[in-house]
Amino acid sequence: MESKNNYYNKLLNTIDYYGLKVNHVKNKEFIMLSTLERECHRSGSTIDKFFYLMEDKEYKITPEEALDNLPLPLIMKAVDSIRKEKNISKRSLSKSIEMDRANYQKYYKSKGSINFSSFTRILEALDVDLISFLERCREINNGNGMEIKEG
């Protein structure tokens, strides 16, 4: 239990550092976040647990970690949902992020997790911040129950 508390303290310190308003992540911090994210995967946390940690007052997880732990189909649904709501065509979104949809899906699938610096370009193209994006993921996830599966 001691090591788990250390882990949560690291999460808490990280979220305090970013103040839940992250515009960009420097490499050093991203490496730290990725390491914490891998520890989370090892402990077998679920999507619901990550959303809970995002809200909980005592233990918090960074927005980047939450994003990194969501299954790709949920992320893609949220991207499409925001794109349609803002009347952004697939073509203009692809141009903004300098890669086509098939390529960025393949990129995420082959890497197994989100490359945050690449994903920032998608958020910019959608003109939405990461917290709002995660809220959309939560809405979609809650609307569909647990039907969304990875892969």
Where in this protein do the model-derived segments appear?
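Short alpha-helical DNA-recognition segment
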Residues: 17-38, 87-106
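Short, basic-rich loop-to-helix N-cap that marks the start of a DNA-contacting helix
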Residues: 30-54, 111-124
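Short, charged recognition helix plus adjacent turn
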Residues: 38, 52-74, 78-84, 134-151
